[in-house]
Swiss-Prot record:
One of its GO terms (biological process) is cobalamin biosynthetic process. It comes from Salmonella typhimurium (strain LT2 / SGSC1412 / ATCC 700720). The keyword Methyltransferase applies. It catalyses: Co-precorrin-4 + S-adenosyl-L-methionine = Co-precorrin-5A + S-adenosyl-L-homocysteine + H(+). This is Cobalt-precorrin-4 C(11)-methyltransferase. Keywords: Cobalamin biosynthesis, Methyltransferase, S-adenosyl-L-methionine, Transferase. Belongs to the precorrin methyltransferase family. Pathway: Cofactor biosynthesis; adenosylcobalamin biosynthesis; cob(II)yrinate a,c-diamide from sirohydrochlorin (anaerobic route): step 4/10.
Length: 257
């Protein structure tokens, strides 16, 4: 028997990066049972709503402010309905889940999170790359340019660039010229590989490759101005070393050399 989800709480569900089949199984089951769905219509693949019952109430949060979103959630829970807040990617990245959760808690409403596949994971899968290449990069920085939401001074692009490790930069493609300038100023060579992925895993996905020196012009020529992720680092280059984990002369708990 399939699980019946508690209607006394709000379910925050990560919608995944775009491909409707990349939602988690639990997220899919929640949509199948949802009676109220509040979704980020400007960001998610709305084909996901096809998983919902025909009679489910559907609200596009792109048209709403925070208080209106909370009121819809609260009204649904009060009516004993299964309420799903469907957000792009994974809700823990640029998802505003804390402010929504705190408002619900203040009203005495429980809430739970179902994680999703974030765009940086979908982009890597689409490109067939890994962020942690042995002897090239073993770290990944996820960040963004400041916008209406400021970025702490210690987290400026120049500071991160000094590490010259793998980077995934969200919400910044409209200012990619500035991104490239600041990364070079911070320490990345101008020849550092860059990939810009528009709507990763969507049918209309598009990838532009270049270097910090020329990526801005290439992205402009491609007409990409939003809904794109910027990947930066030598993990995109040709240098590669095999992991020691699978080396024939390497022993570990499960295998002797």
């Amino acid at each position: 028997m399939s699980e019946t989800f508690d209607p006394r709480c709000v379910w925050f569900v990560g919608a995944g990066p775009g491909d409707r089949e990349l939602i988690t199984l639990k997220g899919y089951r929640l949509l199948q049972q949802a009676q109220v769905v509040i979704y980020a219509g400007s960001l998610i693949n709305t084909e996901l709503l096809d998983y919902c019952p025909a009679q489910a109430e559907r609200y596009d949060s792109a048209e709403l402010h925070l208080e209106q979103i909370i009121e819809l959630m609260a009204a649904g829970v009060k009516a004993g309905k299964t309420v799903v807040r469907l957000q792009t990617g994974d809700v823990s990245l640029y998802g505003s889940v804390r402010e929504q959760g705190e408002e619900l808690t203040r009203r005495g409403i429980d809430w739970q999170v179902v994680p999703g596949v974030s765009a940086f994971l979908g982009a890597a899968a689409e490109l067939g790359v890994e962020y942690t290449v042995p002897e090239v990069s073993q770290s990944l920085i996820i960040t963004r340019l400041e916008g209406r939401t400021p970025v702490p001074a210690r987290e400026q692009l120049e500071a991160f660039a000094s590490h010259q490790t793998s980077m995934a930069i969200y919400l910044s493609v409209q200012r990619i010229h500035r991104v490239a300038e600041r990364l070079i100023a911070g320490g990345y060579p101008a020849t550092t590989p860059v990939a810009v992925i528009y709507k990763a895993t969507w049918p209309e996905s598009q990838t532009v490759r270049g270097t910090l020196a020329d990526i801005s012009d290439k992205v402009r020529d491609a007409g990409i101005r939003k809904t794109a992720l910027i990947l930066v680092g030598n993990f995109l280059g040709k240098e590669y070393h095999y992991s020691r984990l699978y080396a024939a002369d390497f022993s570990h708990e499960y295998r002797k050399a």
